Design a protein with these regions (language model features):
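Cys/His-coordinated zinc-binding microdomains
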Residues: 55
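Residues immediately within or flanking Cys/His clusters that coordinate Zn2+
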Residues: 48
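Sec/Tat signal peptide C-region and signal peptidase I cleavage site
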Residues: 33-37
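Mid-length scaffold segments of soluble, non-membrane domains
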Residues: 73-116
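Thiol/selenol-based redox catalytic cores and closely related redox-interacting motifs
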Residues: 99-162
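N-terminal secretory signal peptides that target proteins for export/translocation
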Residues: 1-18
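Short cysteine-rich clusters marking metal-coordination/redox-active sites
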Residues: 51
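Bacterial N-terminal signal peptides
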Residues: 21-32
Length: 175
């Protein structure tokens, strides 16, 4: 009788381990899936996509593309970081019904690599002698070192990170 109880305990223990293992795998998949959903990948603008700020066709300026992806899957494309920030700071004007809380991701094109990067991780050079499609521009870089070298080589005035960029900074670019 004692042998039968031991066998039952072993079987029960094995079932419990299997249940915990399956539960762990399910939780892991949900965690990975939700982490991926938080950072949607950038997409390439089509020939029909226009900058909502200036009306220019964005595909003509691949070296300057910026984009804001909303949680509902819609995307706004820009022909430079300056117009992207104008839009970001005045969503009521350009996309009423949306707020900054509706934004899933913001991308800008890194100057040297010419690849889209997370705008929140970029270092922006302001006031350089390099102009974008809409004139004076914020020039994005992966590293502060790259931004510093560019600032020195191209007579830049300041290096800023995302949270330092304000409507007043953007207005100064157009003055």
């Amino acid at each position: 009788m004692e042998t039968g109880q031991r066998r039952n305990r072993r079987l029960c223990h094995k079932r419990m381990r299997g249940t915990f293992w399956v539960a762990g795998v399910v939780i892991w998949f949900f965690w990975v899936g939700s982490a991926l959903a938080l950072d949607p990948a950038p997409v390439k603008p089509s020939k029909k996509d226009k900058c909502p700020v200036c009306g220019m066709f964005v595909y003509k300026y691949p070296d300057w593309v910026g984009e804001i992806i909303f949680k509902d899957g819609t995307t706004a494309f820009f022909d430079g970081a300056k117009d992207l920030f104008k839009y970001y700071f005045d969503l009521k004007k350009y996309n009423h019904g949306k707020t900054q809380k509706d934004i899933a991701a913001i991308y800008v094109t890194e100057y040297y690599d010419v690849k889209l990067m997370d705008a929140h991780k970029a270092f922006f050079v302001m006031g350089s002698d390099v102009y974008g499609p809409m004139g004076r521009e914020l020039i994005p870089f992966y590293t502060k070192q790259d931004a510093g070298e560019f600032k020195k080589d191209h007579k830049g005035k300041r290096i800023l990170v995302f949270k330092q960029i304000t409507p007043a900074v953007i207005k100064k670019l157009d003055d």
